[in-house]
């Protein structure tokens, strides 16, 4: 592919918007959950999650292990790779309108759930790469040729080996290519052949990945449990309903926040736009019923792939980072608005810019809240270390037990009420027996020798040696106990 002047302008605009959107992360990125361990030990460990290509990439760019913390370079590289991938499909979807293309494609990053993905100092690279490759894979397969199916299958194996949740992005961009062909009066037969080709590329790649990679590399009880498919028996329907309700509870955090009108407006705009697209197609086309049915199916599919195949997992991970599909859905809504109201570009751009502005304000609040919480955690660990030293029982005790969860930083107490999603985005590391509590302690030079005690302890009278308004501290047997108030 050759880049023309429009591609270069598009990349410049998109990167400019992306830098503004992620500016707090580019200037000061906190250590986000897994980052704690990787920055401390320098290990890889993605292969056990079924993500061997992530291991390979970081092994290569670090010339082996231990890997180093090069933040914010991984995030910057991830955004650049995403921009290059999007430039490959810009012309097909938007023609020469690189300004609207930039605004619409930014919805992938403006996805409020994607904030968690971008917050990782290491994974931000491979997660952005996974999204980028999934888009290219979908595009390559949507050109009916046997060789394209093979290439798409290889790319599918690649993006699944980086981050499996990007599968939903593949599917939603397939829907984008279909609606593009509907608008451009492509024949039903060509649309059907291209769609079948894209689906074939995904299926072949997925099963190859599942058999040759996931089946052989996924290890550890946590990873194995979360990769199991619901068994086909009497509880199948019940399991699917349970997953749908659980994901809806996660999704509803944005509908219950102060920015809810943004997401309702996008859905409303999608419905109106698809109606307009259908009416235009009916006026000019012979296959009226077929086009109508196709658009209805596209609408339902676009909503399904916010969650996608994860509803069929026995124990899916309910976390913002897996809802990458929401960014694809937001993009798809904007694309349909663009197609339905091509003669009103200025109004569409203003609407897209407004969504992006509100999303940027929300993301800045999230990044600052995550940073404030991490600073509080470091302060708590420092204070615990001082208490242990002052009380004099640290030299002969090697185990530490946490009971309860650290409080929110004072500046976060209001934001989690204003925006319920913040409760999911702001990690509270010191949380009972969570393994990252131990890693956080080991990052502090004064408490690095303590190991987390994950068995139950019985608190009896006299166990408490000291306390403050955040926690009580004392000893039970050979274990230091910290109980949060």
From Swiss-Prot:
It comes from the Viruses. Keywords: Host membrane, Membrane, Transmembrane, Transmembrane helix. Its main location: host cell. GO terms for cellular component: host cell membrane; membrane. It is a multi-pass membrane protein. The keyword Nucleotide-binding does not apply. It is found in: Host membrane. This is Uncharacterized 55.3 kDa protein in gtrB 5'region. It comes from Salmonella phage P22 (Bacteriophage P22). Pfam families: Glucos_trans_II (PF14264). The keyword DNA-binding does not apply. The chain crosses the membrane at residues 9-29, 66-86, 98-118, 131-151, 159-179, 194-214, 259-279, 293-313, 322-342, 350-370.
